Amino acid sequence: MKPMYRSRSWRRKYVRTPGGRTVIHFERKKPKIAHCAMCGRPLNGVPRGRPSELRKLPKTKKRPERPYPNLCPSCMRKVIKAQIRAGISL
């Protein structure tokens, strides 16, 4: 095993080959789930994936198609209400 693969930053995936041997394939781990910028709740509709995987997705699959996609829906409502009450236009 290469020294770079001894680190636990690589995920070990055991694969059975057609010849019957079990070999280890090393993959990078998936990043953590996206969180709301205000309250820290996990965001729905945002995929977990490495940048190389996310690059292959269409734009609409990468984040919610609404204002403030980096906020959860309840925080988004609070921000929009605060802006309207302050008289700031979007």
Swiss-Prot record:
Residues 45-69 are annotated as: Disordered. It comes from Thermococcus onnurineus (strain NA1). It comes from the Archaea. GO terms for cellular component: ribonucleoprotein complex; ribosome. Gene3D superfamilies: 6.20.340.10. Pfam families: Ribosomal_L34e. This is Large ribosomal subunit protein eL34. Belongs to the eukaryotic ribosomal protein eL34 family. InterPro entries: Ribosomal_eL34, Ribosomal_eL34_C_sf, Ribosomal_eL34_CS, Ribosomal_L34e_arc-type. GO terms for biological process: translation. Keywords: Ribonucleoprotein, Ribosomal protein.
